[in-house]
């Protein structure tokens, strides 16, 4: 069935009128509610983003500059949103999940269309090139800036429900150490939302995969320790109900019992097994039925667009029309037939308020310590350190060669201070800095220890440079960190540095990317 923009005019006529005063969603205990009344909110969601492997797009920003991304921002095109919002409405959709947006793009048109249709948005904070890497985890300045920029772009819309700070980052026991870095991101994004005085109902959560070896420990870890560090909601990517399965055989019964006493809302962040086609979505009745709806706050079906993975509800014909697939028809009949009764907010007193016990670190089952977490990225500290380095990497050295140079210098000086270890909870003060800043620190540390000009050469890969004497807050931060970089900074940095010449005091770094792998091999 082909549905064009023109054919949807009757459905979307109201969209061009005044913007709907959509009611923001709030969290109370383990449930979502509309903020202005006592009605519980159940997510009837659809994952809404074309494949990351699609051709790059160029987005024009409000300043008339252009930016190129390796993904298609699903909220930046008024034309496509005008095409798709009516179709989402027919599915009784009240939430979409978007996996990557361009924070420099203008999202007003799409967010208005969605708001007028009563549709909320959960946005992932990462993008295909900027996310926490399970094989080489780090929480550093570039990621912090990416994540906060997405929050800045979306926080002003009343129909922004919240954000995911990660998606299936840890997916085996061997990669669970990465969860420490994701939890640090959750902590810092929650703190950022508060510091910016954004709407208090905006939540930060995580979307996990359904791995039997780690699923319980994952849920416990992100909901243990300090409440300020934990997730506001928990998304579960689950594909265990295939074809005409059942509440018991699919594992839904076990998962429901596991989360019965969880203290924050839980929902399916992705669901819709396609091992049996067409997908008849018989799980919808169970998910929104009386038993599961006591625990789960609905779910997000995967996905709107048909791609090579064959999960689509529609196939795109062009910018104004799509073809409805068989899955669309089956899902529509199921989702439009459910109506969970829900809980009255006024009479609801949460009883499951206790946080989970943190999973112990063992080589066989869990590798992330709950405390301490990686430090909050501090660009001021990194800048102060950078300006006080007398020996730095030469400008002729390609960034692709940083790892090799790092392995050499760390074979000559103690680089323990630059490691980041989610299992032991050992994090360097400069661990959030950029790779060049980290390499500069290591080179300068060795140079300062040797005290001779030849110590800053490395076959032409390093060079001496004029330095800046740290003053004020910069001096205080550098002092707190120490020359070996094992200290920590207290308070907020606002200092600067003044120009002088001479040798520097050193800072401390944690290497990300290729450098991180080198460090783990050396330390």
Summary of predicted features, one role per range:
Residues 61-62, 67-88, 142-152, 213-227, ...:
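Short, acidic/polar
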Residues 177-294, 321-327, 348-367, 371:
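Noncatalytic carbohydrate-binding groove/subsite architecture in carbohydrate-active enzymes
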């Amino acid at each position: 069935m082909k549905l064009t923009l023109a054919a949807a005019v009757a459905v979307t006529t109201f969209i061009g009128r005044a913007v709907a005063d959509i009611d923001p969603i709030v969290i109370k205990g383990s449930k979502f509610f509309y903020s202005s009344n006592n009605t519980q909110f159940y997510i009837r969601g659809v994952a809404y983003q074309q494949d990351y492997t699609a051709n790059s797009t160029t987005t024009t920003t409000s300043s008339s500059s252009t930016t190129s991304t390796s993904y298609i921002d699903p909220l930046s095109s008024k034309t496509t949103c005008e095409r798709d919002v009516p179709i989402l409405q027919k599915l009784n959709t009240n939430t979409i999940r978007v996996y990557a947006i361009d924070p420099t793009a203008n999202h007003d048109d799409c967010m208005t269309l969605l708001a007028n249709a009563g549709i909320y948005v959960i946005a992932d904070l990462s993008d295909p090139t900027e996310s926490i890497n399970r094989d080489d985890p780090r929480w550093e300045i570039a990621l912090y800036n990416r994540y906060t920029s997405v929050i800045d772009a979306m926080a002003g819309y009343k129909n922004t429900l919240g954000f995911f700070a990660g998606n299936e980052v840890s997916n085996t026991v061997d990669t669970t150490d990465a969860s420490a870095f994701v939890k640090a991101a959750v902590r810092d994004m929650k703190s950022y939302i508060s510091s910016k005085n954004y709407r208090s109902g905006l939540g930060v959560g995580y979307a996990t995969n359904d791995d039997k070896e780690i699923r319980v420990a994952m849920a416990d870890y992100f909901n243990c320790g300090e409440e300020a560090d934990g997730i506001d909601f928990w998304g579960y990517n689950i594909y265990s109900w295939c074809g005409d399965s059942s509440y018991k055989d699919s594992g839904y019964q076990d998962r429901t019992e596991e989360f019965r006493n969880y203290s924050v809302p839980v929902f399916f962040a992705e669901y819709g097994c396609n091992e049996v086609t067409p997908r008849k979505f018989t799980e919808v009745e169970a998910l929104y039925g009386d038993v599961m709806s006591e625990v789960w706050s609905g779910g997000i079906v995967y996905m709107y667009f048909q791609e090579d993975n064959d999960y689509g509800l529609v196939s795109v014909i062009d910018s104004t029309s799509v073809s409805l697939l068989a899955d669309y028809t089956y899902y529509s009949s199921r989702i439009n037939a459910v109506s969970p009764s829900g809980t009255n907010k006024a009479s609801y007193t949460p009883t499951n308020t206790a946080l989970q016990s943190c999973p112990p670190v063992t080589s066989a089952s869990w590798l992330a310590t709950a405390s301490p977490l990686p430090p909050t990225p501090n660009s001021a500290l990194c800048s102060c350190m950078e300006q006080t380095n007398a020996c730095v990497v030469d400008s002729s050295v390609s960034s692709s060669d940083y790892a090799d140079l790092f392995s050499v210098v760390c074979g000559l000086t103690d680089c323990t201070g630059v490691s980041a270890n989610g299992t032991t909870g050992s994090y360097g003060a400069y661990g959030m800095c950029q790779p060049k800043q980290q390499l500069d620190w290591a080179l300068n540390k060795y140079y300062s220890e040797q005290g001779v000009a030849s110590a800053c050469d490395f076959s032409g890969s390093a060079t001496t440079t004029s330095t800046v004497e740290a003053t004020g807050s910069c001096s205080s931060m550098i002092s707190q960190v120490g020359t070996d970089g094992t200290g920590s900074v207290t308070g907020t940095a606002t200092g600067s540095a003044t120009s002088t010449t001479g040798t520097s005091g050193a800072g401390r770094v944690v290497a990300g990317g290729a450098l991180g792998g080198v460090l783990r091999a050396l330390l």
